[in-house]
């Protein structure tokens, strides 16, 4: 699986066990991602922070 880094021009190949790509952003500024990368379990979103997870190459 390949996941985009914070700047989507770059990506990395995820290590074994991290089978999801994720994008995290503040609810107040949804167009500005704060973090992107590989993750094993999708975190729960909160009132301030939203997580979007997916499982295809560079989907984040």
Curated annotation (Swiss-Prot):
InterPro entries: Cytotoxin_Cobra, Snake_3FTx, Snake_toxin-like_sf, Snake_toxin_con_site, Toxin_cobra-type. One of its GO terms (cellular component) is membrane. It comes from the Eukaryota. Disulfide bonds join 3-21, 14-38, 42-53, 54-59. Signal peptide: none annotated. Keywords: Cardiotoxin, Cytolysis, Disulfide bond, Membrane, Secreted, Target cell membrane, Target membrane, Toxin. This is Cytotoxin 10. It comes from Naja naja (Indian cobra). The lineage of its organism: Eukaryota, Metazoa, Chordata, Craniata, Vertebrata.
């Amino acid at each position: 699986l390949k996941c985009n880094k914070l700047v989507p021009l770059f990506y990395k190949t995820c290590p074994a066990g991290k089978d999801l790509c994720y994008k995290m952003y503040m609810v107040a500024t949804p167009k500005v991602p704060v973090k992107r990368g590989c993750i094993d379990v999708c975190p729960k979103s909160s009132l301030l922070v939203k997580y979007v997870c997916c499982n295809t190459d560079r989907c984040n």
